[in-house]
Amino acid sequence: SQALPKKAMGAFSHWSNPNIGGIDDRTKKQFVMYDLSLAGYGGRYGEDGPEALSPVMNCTNIPIEVHESLNPIRINCLELLQDSGGAGLWRGGCGLRKDIELLNSKAVLSHLADRHKFPPYGVFNGKAGRLAETLLIRGNEKKVLSSKGVEDLQEGDILSFRPSGAGG
């Protein structure tokens, strides 16, 4: 960043790809919902970081209608996480929260994410983005999930994916 300060940018939010799978109660066939959690890019010289993008080229947001028509789930929330990007002269882009409710009797979550412990750094006095968080909401209980792992799910469970914002 010192050699080419006008080319440096704050750290990207993070990568997260939750997978939910099982036997669909409606069809008795296997299903796998593979998702991409979209997040922000870091602030860079002259502009704020873009919001809700994938770090992988040629990948875009999978429409809610596609997920809901192919899988026994419902998307209850899809919104930018306001102020999740790091502050700075040019702020980091925000992450995109997604809450997924399981409509099936059971399923399994395989979760792989980052930035749950170490926030995306800022550059040139820009601040770090907010830490990522993944919640399992079962009834009135909220359980914070680790960034990597496998979790058994039951009908009515809500998974809340809250990616970090990028560095400013």
Regions found by a protein language model. Name each.
Residues 1-168:
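Glycine/proline-enriched, intrinsically flexible loops and inter-domain linkers
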